Amino acid sequence: MCRRIFKEQTSENGEIPFYKIGTFGGEADAFISRELFEEYKAKYQYPKKGDILISASGSIGRTVVFTGKNEYFQDSNIVWLNHDKHLDNSFLKCFYSIVKWAGIEGSTIKRLYNDNILNTAITLPSVEEQQKIGAYFENLDNLITLHQRKPIVVNSSSTMNALPNQHLYFQVLE
């Protein structure tokens, strides 16, 4: 997990996006300085490109694939699993989407602790099979996303002869 960032260390503008549990998977609304980012990245654990980040509080189990961009995440609320080459991240992302975390059902304040993650049994097929399963579900997710998008119709208010003065209007079809 990343090192704790305090509110006074953030700003509304800046170089490095800082994701809290409420902005995780969306747009950052806080930023930290490059200097603080570089210091913490060098001193403390930091995810590697392709790691699956998981929310450990709030909307427990929400996942995001870490892109490798310079960004920082809220301490123990956003975690990832360091693992060896016997586990494929695309398969892990699928697993995270269906797992029933032991010990969090019924509690008033939902929280996913390291023990919940580390003590969860997972049956692993071969890495090659994990990659195929992960790719299959990633493609399925992409198809679902494409079908959920609304088409955009583009109408031109002028002819091609008046291209420099052309205006485009966008209409979302319901």
Question: Where do the model's predicted regions map?
Answer:
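Feature detects amphipathic, helix-rich regulatory segments
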Residues: 1-174
